[in-house]
Amino acid sequence: AGFYPYTPLHLRSLGLEHASAWMSLGQITEIIAMFALGGLLVRWRLKWIFAAGLTLGVVRFALSALDTRAGLITGILLHGASFTLVLITAQIYVDQRVDPAWRGRAQALLSLVNGGFGNMLGYLGTGGWFALCTASGTTRWPAFWGGLSAAMAAVLVFFLLSYRGRSTGLSPAPAPPAS
């Protein structure tokens, strides 16, 4: 949740105006990642696609922590791919792994967690972290983004150690009902 509210502030602090235009660069890589996702799904397990998205997120925040224009813009470019590989893969996971009778509820819960409670807690947490990294109107961007990168790295390690899934990416299409 730290990307959307604080990247524009960091862009301005680096002398880059028109934050919306710079932020839209992430949409380009998001679209590319969506096209690539189909190929990844037949070659990689969902675990590794999700882990790749989390890894891109760690790198995105680490690059932003460099406090340079190039680092921040590269981080923005990585955001689109990270977003797709994490959030879209999570939706695919629910679609593939949850019993059809429960799938609608599971997708609704995923939306509530991602767009509701998760977003709210993320914004509150990053807001508190931002306040801790800001003194006298000056933000210590390396500390801010570095902290988010470390937190995301911890999530990545937890995910890699705890996730147990199937040995294949997508499950085969269900057989048509017998007539």
What residue ranges belong to the model's regions?
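Helix-to-loop junctions at the C-terminal end of transmembrane segments
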Residues: 32-46, 130-131
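Helix-loop boundary and gating motifs at the non-cytosolic
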Residues: 1-24
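Structural signature of the two symmetry-related core transmembrane helices
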Residues: 48-63
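Loop-to-transmembrane helix entry/capping segments in MFS-fold secondary transporters
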Residues: 17, 98-113
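Helix-loop junctions at membrane interfaces in 12-TM secondary transporters
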Residues: 63-76
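A membrane-interface helix-boundary motif in multi-pass transporters
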Residues: 127-152
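Multi-pass alpha-helical transporter architecture, strongest
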Residues: 144-179
